[in-house]
């Protein structure tokens, strides 16, 4: 008759094999979720996925990753407690992958909750710069170039710091400086009209390849000049602060250029 200690020893390899299999499955699921999240943006950018499908893929990947993170952490503790080091290491790998998959979308979601639900930001809410040259490029885009009072109200509350820049140089010099800064931003310059003191450009986001259109307007202001800017997304309801960040970055560089 086999006594209890001998039976435990006999079952140990089989039990360890089962734990390793479970840990391997968790790793595979975590890797699949990470891959789905990574491919969602390029999938939309190259026309394989629609916008809704791409966003939904990220949402589901992040949700599943959050669940797998908990499973992997519990699995790590249990496997280590039972002395199954290899299975524990696999669970650690799964936890790391799940953490990297779930954290960025979660941060973006929380950030979006505290930002205005707008996709159009300008330094002049009373008389925003108007698009001209980029209009043909916006055919079929979901978002209109019409600036509404509802957008202005949300911008005032969410981005009170967005304001025009005053330069102590004539308008044509301000235009030249603005054009130089615009080129340094890596945007595709669509038009630079010195006669109208207007610059238009398009910025493309890295992951999804979203197109955001920019217009910069320069006006005389006494002995100096005033520079206004507008940044508008072609698709999407909320831009998660991207357009406001772009306007701030441009204006800061323009002011730094003046200081030098």
Language-model region placement:
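Internal/C-terminal transmembrane anchor helices
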Residues: 82-112
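Short beta-strand segments that buttress and anchor functional surface loops
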Residues: 200-205
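Membrane-anchoring hydrophobic segments
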Residues: 1-35
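Beta-strand/loop substructures that line and gate deep hydrophobic ligand-binding cavities in soluble
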Residues: 208-237
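Membrane-interface segments at or immediately adjacent to transmembrane helices
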Residues: 107-183
